[in-house]
Curated annotation (Swiss-Prot):
One of its GO terms (molecular function) is ATP binding. The keyword Calcium does not apply. This is Cytidylate kinase. Signal peptide: none annotated. One of its GO terms (cellular component) is cytosol.
Length: 230
C-alpha cells in the first residue's frame, strides 16, 4: 500500500455491507470499521443500564462515558464496550429492534461520526454503514452503495442468525427490515441516501464473491486512474 485509500460502503440493513467489507479489507490489508457495530454496542449498553433508547440525553450520557472499541482478531473484528466483549450480544433481536432509535439521535450521530473519522485518520480503511459516503467520509476515494430486495435481505439475516444460534423469525425480520428502512431513510440527521458519486450495486441475485469482485474492480480502477498502489 503506497498511499492512503478510503473505501465507503453504504446501504440498508442486511444488504451485505459488513460481510463484503471485511473480505475486501482482509484481501487488501486495510483496516475494517463496522460503524453499525458501534451503534449496536451503544444500544446494548443503554439496554443493560435500563435506559430508554428513545431518550437522547440519557443515551448520549452513556456514550460519553463508554469506551467502544473495534478490535481486530484472528476470527474477525470484535466489539468491546468498556473492555467487555459484546460481539455476540449486539446481534441479538432486542438490540436489533432498538438500534434505529439510538442511531437517529442528532447528538449521538455527531459524536459517532467524530469517532469514526478519527479511526480513519491516516489509514487505509474500508468503512461500512449508512452515511459513510455522505457524512463520515465524504471525500472517500471509492464509494459504493449496496441494495437488495427486502425479501432477500430478510433471508440473509435469518440464515445468519440461525448459524449464530440466535432466535430468528423470517416474517418478523421482513417487518423489522422494512421498518428500519423507513426510519433510516427519513431521519433528519444523516439519512440513508446514496452519495452522488457512489456506485450502486444490486446484490439481490449476486453471490458475496461477485459483489466483492465488483467492488475490488472499482478500487483497482481508481488506483489505475490515479496512480495509487494497493
Amino acid at each position: 500500500m503506497e498511499q492512503r485509500i478510503t473505501v465507503a460502503i453504504d446501504g440498508p440493513a442486511a444488504a451485505g455491507k459488513s460481510t463484503v467489507a471485511k473480505m475486501i479489507a482482509n484481501q487488501l490489508g486495510f483496516i475494517y470499521v463496522d460503524t453499525g457495530a458501534m451503534y449496536r454496542a451503544l444500544t446494548y449498553q443503554a439496554l443493560q443500564e435500563g435506559i430508554d433508547p428513545k431518550n437522547e440525553d440519557s443515551v448520549l450520557t452513556i456514550l460519553m462515558n463508554s469506551n467502544i472499541e473495534l478490535r481486530q482478531a484472528e476470527n474477525g473484528q470484535r466489539v468491546f464496550v468498556n473492555n467487555k466483549d459484546v460481539s455476540e450480544e449486539i446481534r441479538y433481536p432486542d438490540v436489533t429492534s432498538k438500534v434505529s432509535f439510538v442511531a437517529e439521535h442528532p447528538s449521538i450521530r455527531k459524536e459517532m461520526v467524530s469517532r469514526q473519522q478519527k479511526l480513519a485518520n491516516n489509514r487505509s480503511v474500508v468503512m461500512d454503514g449508512r452515511d459513510i459516503g455522505t457524512h463520515v467520509l465524504p471525500d472517500a476515494e471509492v464509494k459504493i452503495f449496496l441494495i437488495a430486495s427486502v425479501e432477500e435481505r430478510a433471508k440473509r439475516r435469518h440464515e445468519e442468525n440461525i448459524k449464530k444460534g440466535i432466535p430468528s423469525d423470517i416474517k418478523l425480520l421482513k417487518k423489522e427490515i422494512s421498518d428500519r428502512d423507513e426510519i433510516d431513510s427519513n431521519r433528519e440527521v444523516s439519512p440513508l441516501i446514496k452519495a452522488e458519486d457512489a456506485i450502486e450495486v444490486d446484490t439481490t441475485s449476486l453471490s458475496i464473491a461477485e459483489v466483492k469482485d465488483q467492488i475490488l474492480n472499482e478500487i483497482f480502477k481508481y488506483n489505475t486512474q490515479n496512480n495509487k498502489g494497493v
